Amino acid sequence: NVQINNKNVKLYRDISYGKGMPHRKLDIITPADMSNDTKLPVIFWMHGGGFIAGDKQYKNQLLSRIAEQGYIIVNVNYALAPQYKYPTPLVQLNQAVKFVKENKHELPIDFDQVVIGGDSAGAQLTSQYVAMQTNEDLRDEMHFEQQFKPSQIKAAVFFGGFYNMKTVRATEFPRIQLFMKSYTGTSHWET
């Protein structure tokens, strides 16, 4: 496990959420001096790794610096491709959000101040998740249950992701074919 050396935060590691898939663990990082009397905004984060690699623990050091500013961080792991294909990580993010909401009595989370974000593949995943939370037609097409009203999502942070499947191949990003074929199960992933 990657250790975080930050006395200003508390780390609750490897909390199980959901059932039936691997990597269904999340870490929660809170300010060390958090009081249950004051609700704090929450950030849901998903790591990168081209859908085929990566782990939540590698972002905990960075996310701990954000938590010490007065945020509760929920850092979500997800099942990796090629064994688990699209939309498995999105289903898992929805399970993680639902788990945290159902156990909200344990943390002073202000669910009217939600931030959703990720890096690289996690940015792509969370961008699609935010779109599903704010677009009823897309949510219905994907058969997802809405967890947040658009007014509850105060910000989205998409760091280094890709968002337009029709143009991403043209970027010639190294190994994009491997990542996307592993994740979608097809060579024709743009459509």
Predicted regions and their residues:
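Alpha/beta-hydrolase superfamily serine-hydrolase fold, recognizing
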Residues: 1-191
